[in-house]
């Protein structure tokens, strides 16, 4: 398992939380605009993401990155303004068999 973020503080929290839960998790600082480390390790069995589309550039970068990672993709999105752009791209150019949209309130 590899947990990533671009913020150094988040990387430290990822490592600390894994240790507190008795888990071994590799952590890495990764920028989606420089995805080579993730792509070299592909294909991934499962890609999990939560609240990733908080900036317009994230939607574009993720849309370019995710097809190269392989495996299943599960994203949790709270309804950010840029999520529609991201979803529209994958409805036009699917990266998998299914896209489900679930609303949790």
Model region roles, listed by residue range:
Residues 1-105:
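S-adenosylmethionine-dependent methyltransferases
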